[in-house]
Swiss-Prot record:
Residues recorded as bearing (3R)-3-hydroxyaspartate in the entry: D15
Protein family: Belongs to the type B lantibiotic family.
Originating organism: Streptomyces sp. (strain R2075) (Streptoverticillium sp. (strain R2075))
Cross-link (Lysinoalanine (Ser-Lys)) at residue(s): S6-K19
Protein name: Lantibiotic duramycin B
Function: Is a potent inhibitor of human phospholipase A2. Exhibits only a weak antibacterial activity against B.subtilis, and does not display antimicrobial activity against S.aureus, S.mitis, E.coli, K.pneumoniae, P.vulgaris and C.albicans.
Cross-link (Lanthionine (Ser-Cys)): S4-C14
Major place of residence: secreted
Covalent crosslink: Beta-methyllanthionine (Cys-Thr): C1-T18, C5-T11
């Protein structure tokens, strides 16, 4: 996943869930 979990309601879980 990318480190763009700074712009989203559930993208904060991009730690290893979202892309």
């Amino acid at each position: 996943c990318r480190q763009s979990c700074s712009f989203g309601p559930l993208t904060f879980v991009c730690d290893g869930n979202t892309k």
